[in-house]
Amino acid sequence: MDNNQIQELIISFLDDVSELSISGKDCNFSIKIVSKDFINLGTIDRHKIIMRLFTDLLQSGELHAISLDLKAPSEV
């Protein structure tokens, strides 16, 4: 899995992403997303939404660790 594949997965899932940055390599990534999809959601619910995208990859070992910074536009 590389940065472009992660980006494509996120963009295809969320309706409105105003900022997306991905850093890392191999199987460890840090992801920052600013999206209207996160309005009125708490931190845990935001993380659940994004982590669902990566469940299979984490279970298979293709991804090992993901650090998330998830915000609504009004929080930036």
Question: What is each model feature region?
Answer:
Residues M1-V76:
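N-terminal, polar/charged subdomain of small-to-medium soluble alpha/beta proteins
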